[in-house]
From Swiss-Prot:
Highest taxon above the source species: Eukaryota
InterPro entries reported for this sequence: COMM (IPR017920), COMMD3 (IPR037355)
Record note on quaternary structure: Component of the commander complex consisting of the CCC subcomplex and the retriever subcomplex. Component of the CCC (COMMD/CCDC22/CCDC93) subcomplex consisting of COMMD1, COMMD2, COMMD3, COMMD4, COMMD5, COMMD6, COMMD7, COMMD8, COMMD9, COMMD10, CCDC22 and CCDC93; within the complex forms a heterodimer with COMMD2. Interacts with NFKB1/p105. Interacts with CCDC22, CCDC93, SCNN1B, CUL3, CUL4A, CUL4B, CUL5.
UniProt subcellular location: Cytoplasm; Nucleus
Example GO biological process: sodium ion transport
Cited PROSITE patterns: COMM
Function statement: Scaffold protein in the commander complex that is essential for endosomal recycling of transmembrane cargos; the commander complex is composed of the CCC subcomplex and the retriever subcomplex. May modulate activity of cullin-RING E3 ubiquitin ligase (CRL) complexes. May down-regulate activation of NF-kappa-B. Modulates Na(+) transport in epithelial cells by regulation of apical cell surface expression of amiloride-sensitive sodium channel (ENaC) subunits.
Name of this protein: COMM domain-containing protein 3
Disulfide bond entries: none
Length: 195
C-alpha cells in the first residue's frame, strides 16, 4: 500500500499518545469507520466531547488519514499481519494495533461491499438526446429571451446493472464549446491509435 506523505503524517500523529489518548484514539477510529460506512454520517461524528481538546485541524487531518488507510486496506484486502506491519512502521503501540485490527475485522465485510459498489470503470455514453427550450426571464430591470438546450446522455457502466441518465441544460455557446471539445478529444484519440 502506498500512501501519500500527508496521510502518513496524519497517521503518525494518530499513533502519538500525547496527541490522542486511548479514548480519543478509539473515538476517532470508530468515527472514521462510521463516516465511510454510514451514508447518514456527517461531521458531527467528530463533535464528541472527548475530542474537543484536540485542535480541529489536527483532528480532521487524522480522521482523513485513518479513513484513507482504511479504504486502502480494504482495497488490497489486507489481513491482520499486513495491517500490523504498517501500523508498527507508523509507531503504533500494541494496544492500538489490536484495537485497529479488531475494528477493521468487525467492519471488513461492509467495507468490501462498499468498495465493490463503487465500480472500476467510467460510464460509457451510449446515446444522446436533446431538445430546444426557450427561456424567458423577466424582472423589473431587463428581459432575457434566449434559447437553451436540454441534453440527456444515456450512459452504461459495466460494473453496474442500472443505466442512469445524465441531464443538463446549456446555452448555445456552451453546447458549441462542448461539441468542439468532444471533436478535439476524438481527433486526439484517433492520432493516438495510429501510432
Amino acid at each position: 500500500m502506498e500512501l501519500s506523505e500527508s496521510v502518513q503524517k496524519g497517521f503518525q500523529m494518530l499513533a502519538d499518545p500525547r496527541s490522542f489518548d486511548s479514548n480519543a484514539f478509539t473515538l476517532l477510529l470508530r468515527a472514521a469507520f462510521q463516516s465511510l460506512l454510514d451514508a447518514q454520517a456527517d461531521e458531527a461524528v467528530l463533535d464528541h466531547p472527548d475530542l474537543k481538546h484536540i485542535d480541529p485541524v489536527v483532528l480532521k487531518h487524522c480522521h482523513a488519514a485513518a479513513a484513507t488507510y482504511i479504504l486502502e486496506a480494504g482495497k488490497h484486502r489486507a489481513d491482520k499481519s499486513t495491517l500490523s506491519t504498517y501500523l508498527e512502521d507508523c509507531k503504533f503501540d500494541r494496544e492500538r494495533i489490536e484495537l485497529f485490527c479488531t475494528e477493521y475485522q468487525n467492519n471488513k465485510n461492509s467495507l468490501e461491499i462498499l468498495l465493490g459498489s463503487i465500480g472500476r470503470s467510467l460510464p460509457h455514453i451510449t446515446d444522446v438526446s436533446w431538445r430546444l427550450e426557450y427561456q424567458i426571464k423577466t424582472n423589473q430591470l431587463h428581459r432575457m429571451y434566449r434559447p437553451a438546450y436540454l441534453v440527456t446522455l444515456s450512459v452504461q457502466n459495466t460494473d453496474s446493472p442500472s443505466y442512469p441518465e445524465i441531464s443538463f441544460s446549456c446555452s448555445m455557446e456552451q453546447l458549441q464549446d462542448l461539441v468542439g471539445k468532444l471533436k478535439d478529444a476524438s481527433k486526439s484519440l484517433e492520432r493516438a491509435t495510429q501510432l
